[in-house]
Amino acid sequence: MKKAILMMTFGSPEEITFEGVADFFTNIRRGVRPQDHEIQTLYDNYVRIGGTPLQKITHQEVALVEARLGNEYSVYFANKFSSPFIPDVIGQMEADGIEQCICLILEPHYSFYSVMGYEKFLESKQIQFLVIKDWYQEEALLNYWADEIAKILKEEVKQDSFKIIFSAHSVPIFALDFGDPYIDQIFENSKLVVEKLGLSSEQYTNTWQSESDIGIPWIKPDVLEYLREQTAHPDHYIFVPISFISEHIEVLFDNDVECYDLCQEFGVNYHRPPMPNTDSRLIDALVNTVRVNENQEFKEFLPEEETFDELVPSDETKNILAESEDLQMPEFVKKLIEKKGRENVKMPYLIKKMLEKAGKLPKE
């Protein structure tokens, strides 16, 4: 039986031009081209950081995993929103005779808002899939973050006052209505790293970053809002974008530009540990998570229904949701309700369940 590993990431513009960024942004918006001013802002951000190294770094990560596991698996790479696209790579895998595929998403935490976006492309009459849903608890990855933060504390912070700010990509608050485990995983991940450092709960905090302006409420506090709300600041802030593993725009701009600029304004020293990128500890984590999961059941995939229906809100999530009595209904869902000719539109399972919960599911 021919087996493969499919490593997947978000993607990035194929060229840093206005239209190159527009094409990428349009893919993110599911085929709806954003307004020109939105494209211009994102383009300017890419120019500010000198482009993005994400694809180069990811190809190196893939090659390093292949060097470790290539004798047993064919290793492939695909993006969610740029070339090579997941369906195209699956087509190549079929042509190569692959029968089983381990899907390794290069995001350590599970959120149906993000990871389910990969799962929905996993369709094949030939290949059975096994999706590794999360791998943030891998010891090698925890050690990476603890070691790199410890270096900053020892070599740069020394005896001065500091605060570690763990940040993670925000998700829409409606995700919590359906038991998305992402927030709990981020909190646990941060706690595990802090425990390795031997620090107290007062020496770190959790924030969120990189939310999109699509007309819906997102999980708070946003990292920039958190900084602005502080009445007093320590001598040092150590920013740890823990939901990411590679340098890309949401680290190089959202952290290294926006957070850095605010630190300059407040007279605080800005620090950020290097991203794992191609570090051997990250590769150890990726290889080990394959080993831990490789004997699980492979299946012909109906990912949205199966994954979504497994989710149950945690107590932490219920506490957050207690502040809002009603389901947060995004504008794009409202438009979907009003859309004419929707019988020709395949409704995503997530949206169907949201409408069902709100009592607004269109009649068949």
Swiss-Prot record:
Question: In which pathway is this protein known to take part?
Answer: Porphyrin-containing compound metabolism; protoheme biosynthesis
Q: Where does Fe(2+) bind?
A: 169, 250
Looking at the keywords, is Transferase present? Answer: no
Give the GO cellular component terms, alphabetically: cytoplasm
A single Pfam family it belongs to is Ferrochelatase
Listed name of the protein: Coproporphyrin III ferrochelatase
Gene3D superfamilies attached to this UniProt entry: 3.40.50.1400
Residues recorded as binding Fe-coproporphyrin III, renumbered to this chain, are 29, 118
Q: What class of enzyme is it?
A: lyase
Q: Where in the cell is it found?
A: Cytoplasm
Name the protein family.
Belongs to the ferrochelatase family.
